[in-house]
């Protein structure tokens, strides 16, 4: 018999809580990640007011320096800790896959100097469109459309760029390159990047609208991932007949593997929370697992190094957290975590190698406190333990700590 009938896992994309022990092995614009601290630096530089997460225990998570504006609770309503990543990567897919029990020992390919000419030529031949060679490098997604969007509007050329992550991104103005065509080109790019020397984690369609100087990326983003190389706990749940619900880009990240209810993409964090609430309210969702990703922290503010916007985004989530708690049933468990860091005060524009926070809350809790510091995959091990299925590759359950 399951301890909790339903578990809801919410990933606050990129909300790290301090540099991981191996952070100096990872860099941003040539600067090691060893001094990165997403929540710590936001709290210190622009202030952070998240009383609802604080009540569960966010300020109680052990740190060398306590969060400046998030106090520890003497009697929190839940459990808290921080988790370390063991996989060799700091990208979204690696983080989520490890959360679901995989250890990625061979990282995907990254292209600091741009993609090989062979890749670009194949895409040109397939699409019938030229590729702007000047964008073929790690580039900020907002900067690349600012710099080359006007040219694309004139010529119809493709904007292809990458980042420190193993991704190939194609930006296209929706009035110039229709969504169906963009998605078709991305599907082709996915088909030619499934093995080395160009094994990529994701192909990302990045549509945008607007006029030169005032371009805006739309919610029609599409991620084309590869399937996990080994069964995750999602697969184990699915095989056991336990419902799995995906909210936001979760279905894309796992390429649909182990997910039997895709609730769709999010237009924003607020829309994602609305979808989660709708999912939690489904009469047929009596037992199972929901998995939500809220990406605005990362996509809108982390990469753009906008600490004020990031803080406000955290405030907005915290203000809606009581709605999520109110939608819980007596034997539900809520887990709030992240997948990597993206310190908006740090060098560069890419992710930072950090611990992730973990907050656990249930109306059924009679106790509270700290869970021992562990690893990302402990989350999936706990989910597996609760529902009586096998774990994946790694992870240790903390289910017995939740009382």
Swiss-Prot record:
The chemistry this enzyme catalyses reads: 2-deoxy-alpha-D-ribose 1-phosphate = 2-deoxy-D-ribose 5-phosphate; alpha-D-ribose 1-phosphate = D-ribose 5-phosphate
Residues bound to Mn(2+) 2 are 298, 303, 351
In alphabetical order, the GO MF annotations are: magnesium ion binding; manganese ion binding; phosphopentomutase activity
Coarsely, its chief localization is cytoplasm
Q: Which Gene3D superfamilies match?
A: Alkaline Phosphatase, subunit A, Phosphopentomutase
Q: What InterPro entries is this protein classified in?
A: Alkaline_phosphatase_core_sf, DeoB, Metalloenzyme, Phosphopentomutase_DeoB_cap_sf
Locations listed in the record: Cytoplasm
PTM (free text): Phosphorylated.
Q: Which Pfam families match?
A: Metalloenzyme (PF01676)
According to its UniProt entry, one GO biological process term is: metabolic compound salvage
Q: Which domain of life is it from?
A: Bacteria
Pathway per its UniProt entry is: Carbohydrate degradation; 2-deoxy-D-ribose 1-phosphate degradation; D-glyceraldehyde 3-phosphate and acetaldehyde from 2-deoxy-alpha-D-ribose 1-phosphate: step 1/2
Keyword Metal-binding carried by entry: yes
Q: What Enzyme Commission number(s) does the record list for this chain?
A: 5.4.2.7
Tell me its cofactors: Mn(2+)
Q: How is the cofactor bound?
A: Binds 2 manganese ions.
- GO CC, alphabetical: cytosol
Q: What class of enzyme is it?
A: isomerase
What UniProt keywords are attached to this protein's entry? Cytoplasm, Isomerase, Manganese, Metal-binding, Phosphoprotein
Residues noted as binding Mn(2+) 1 in the record, renumbered to the chain: 13, 339-340
Q: Does the keyword Metal-binding apply?
A: yes
The family annotation for this protein states: Belongs to the phosphopentomutase family.
PANTHER family assigned: PHOSPHOPENTOMUTASE (PTHR21110:SF0)
Q: Which HAMAP family match?
A: Phosphopentomut
Role noted for this protein: Isomerase that catalyzes the conversion of deoxy-ribose 1-phosphate (dRib-1-P) and ribose 1-phosphate (Rib-1-P) to deoxy-ribose 5-phosphate (dRib-5-P) and ribose 5-phosphate (Rib-5-P), respectively.
* Protein name as it appears in the record: Phosphopentomutase
Q: Which organism is it from?
A: Streptococcus pneumoniae (strain ATCC BAA-255 / R6)
The taxonomic lineage of its organism, from the top, reads: Bacteria, Bacillati, Bacillota, Bacilli, Lactobacillales
